[in-house]
């Protein structure tokens, strides 16, 4: 496993790409609409998780009776700061309490959500007080435990048993050895699984074009408090059609908030410059749309006129109908994880000469003696910290490219650990150790080629697919420059698009990454191989570190936001469903 080569192919294959060979790679109106929506916040996967709590063998701090326990939940930031999120009710006189009150939290794949749980014995004099008014420093501390939300949801039965420990900073000898266990169980909200399929039809849409009919499409957005509506779905663009019948659109109840949450449905006339004209809009909930479907009635679009207090809506003759409204329950990302599917992390690091001499402070590979991470180390750690929870053995393939290892010619895919036979290392720290060792055991060279490392990752994914393994692979490529094998890289990506593989690319340094962005399907360009084959799905996500390092979105969030969707697209394209597994003991 892990052999590298440079012939632009990989052992094994995959299905022929959906769409066939003769399609153009030019961006279509529908691709441009995708990019337009993403610029307005259409992104990411969000699931509502309900956590329930119980405990066993709590420490008894009461003299006459047993403890009266309450659990408090905090979120823990990267800097260690705590923010309280939830308090349970108080369960009286029990060392094995089962709390009734549950805690609901939004699961976000791209963020490490660290939770801290503290259990208190509530003093008798406060038992008639509301939980939220209790002063915790006046209660007896029974123990605390911490874990990430990812650790809970990746368990086969979504249950984790945590040993309650003393508070951080309290001397070990002052604390009894046994404080009991806290059991945390997660359930995904049904709203996350409930999918609504809707077919919209327009009638007598007004023309916004002078010499032709409009090219209409719909954008469905949810209304958020104190903010611009956020797009959650859209239809395709239909050319020159005043009476369009669009393909079905899918919405989960979770996406929109609830079935009664108001939605803005905009009908727009597509323009190639991105400035789409508003034909008209309506505001309706899913419940309203269902009623329109059952009644067979249309609703008139309205066009806002005027501004400020003079704002009015002009009701149009143009109408919108709901020809189909069905609700189904779909498999979710978390269901696949619970049934045993894993995400396997891989990394490939650029050692080309343009990075600079690693012994000098101006090098992108410079190891700061103060411990401050360079850009390569940051990307490895931050992406790895998220993905490691989804890989049971935490053995990660790691490669370098663009350098001359000891005793061999320049290689565009060599094992980072220095081995000639295997590429895996143990854990994120193993990657960091192999990276640090390689810096001074290879000679930086060039050029910058991606094809060989993508082919190496594709080989592993292809072999896993042949064995029907429940694995999906994520390759992180970190680079400082523009690739010189653009077409070969396109070919590799198109071939890999049928495999259980996604590719994350981080650009470090000040290079011009326009060519790199072509590989990322976010901007509506379909990747085409040299043989004319079209990628069956988008598997690449690219970010330039300089573009976001001072912004509000972290490198990890920008890279990983689309990964669950890419995973689900692969599973649904191949009709792979989660299988029920027997719950294992914690």
UniProtKB/Swiss-Prot annotation:
Lipid-attached positions, N-myristoyl glycine: 2
Q: What is this protein called?
A: Protein BONZAI 2
Please give the subunit comment from the record: Interacts with BAP1 and BAP2.
Cofactor needs? Ca(2+)
Q: Which CDD domains match?
A: C2A_Copine, C2B_Copine, vWA_copine_like
Q: Which SMART domains match?
A: C2, VWA
Any GO MF annotation of the entry: calcium-dependent phospholipid binding
The consequence of inactivating this gene is: No visible phenotype; due to partial redundancy with BON1 and BON3. Bon2 and bon3 double mutant has no visible phenotype. Bon1 and bon2 double mutant is seedling-lethal when grown at 22 degrees Celsius. Bon1, bon2 and bon3 triple mutant is seedling-lethal at any temperature.
Gene name of this polypeptide: BON2
A Gene Ontology biological process term: defense response
Expression sites by tissue? Expressed in roots, leaves and stems. Expressed in young growing tissues.
What PANTHER family does UniProt report for this protein, alphabetically?
COPINE, PROTEIN BONZAI 2
Assigned keywords, A-Z: Calcium, Cell membrane, Lipoprotein, Membrane, Metal-binding, Myristate, Plant defense, Repeat
Identify the taxonomic lineage of the organism of origin. Answer: Eukaryota, Viridiplantae, Streptophyta, Embryophyta, Tracheophyta
The primary site where this protein sits is: membrane
Q: List the membrane topology term(s).
A: Lipid-anchor
